[in-house]
């Protein structure tokens, strides 16, 4: 693994679903909005940056793609990799439109309320089944808080200025304290 691979940001783009038959093909589920786009990002890697799958060809299956990979593994080897996430390097993805963003790009962004000084930062973007949530770290707070990633709760995500505005951040922080009592 090169030094570049160690520092690159990897984005989960799909998942291996195991072997397809005995001729070396594999089943892959795409997470991308345009499922075919998964195969335009070059070799797909595991979370450590090691190349797992270099697609040569891909054809649609029922809820997945059947891929002929460059890698020559046995059926049992591909089946052992079932469930492994396939990542692409962030720099391989197209730039988001002006009013769009990648969740990965929100991580580490400062969070403002009304002032000019950041009051928190985004630790992660989570989804526990009921919608996307920003996991927010507030300096000195005992735990992170979760804020729904909606226009009502997060009215400003300014990628150019590298800032997120959550005017009611204190309400979310206080809600966690209310739940504990």
Curated annotation (Swiss-Prot):
Per the record, GO CC terms?
A: cytoplasm; ribosome
Residue ranges annotated for the PRC barrel domain, each copy included: 98-172
> What Pfam families does this protein map onto?
PRC, RimM
Question: What UniProt keywords apply to this chain's record, in alphabetical order?
Answer: Chaperone, Cytoplasm, Ribosome biogenesis, rRNA processing
Q: Which SUPFAM superfamilies match?
A: PRC-barrel domain, Translation proteins
What name does UniProt use for this protein? Ribosome maturation factor RimM
Q: Which gene encodes it?
A: rimM
Free-text function comment from the UniProt entry: An accessory protein needed during the final step in the assembly of 30S ribosomal subunit, possibly for assembly of the head region. Essential for efficient processing of 16S rRNA. May be needed both before and after RbfA during the maturation of 16S rRNA. It has affinity for free ribosomal 30S subunits but not for 70S ribosomes.
- GO biological process terms, semicolon-separated: ribosomal small subunit biogenesis; rRNA processing
Q: What's the source species for this entry?
A: Hyphomonas neptunium (strain ATCC 15444)
């Amino acid at each position: 693994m090169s030094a570049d691979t160690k520092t690159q940001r990897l984005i989960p783009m799909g998942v291996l679903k195991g072997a397809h038959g005995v001729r070396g093909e594999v089943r892959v589920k795409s997470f991308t909005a345009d499922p075919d786009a998964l195969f335009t990002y070059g070799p797909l890697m595991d979370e450590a940056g090691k190349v797992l799958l270099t697609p040569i060809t891909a054809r649609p299956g029922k809820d997945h793609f059947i891929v002929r990979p460059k890698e020559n593994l046995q059926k049992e080897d591909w089946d052992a990799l079932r469930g492994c996430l396939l990542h692409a390097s962030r720099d391989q993805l197209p730039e988001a439109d002006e009013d769009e963003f990648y969740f990965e790009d929100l991580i580490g962004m400062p969070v403002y309320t009304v002032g000019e000084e950041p009051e928190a930062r985004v630790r992660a973007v989570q989804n526990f089944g009921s919608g996307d949530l920003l996991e927010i770290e507030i300096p000195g707070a005992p735990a992170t808080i979760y804020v729904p990633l909606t226009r009502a709760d997060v009215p400003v995500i300014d990628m150019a200025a590298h800032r997120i505005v959550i005017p009611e951040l204190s309400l979310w922080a206080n809600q966690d304290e209310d739940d504990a009592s």
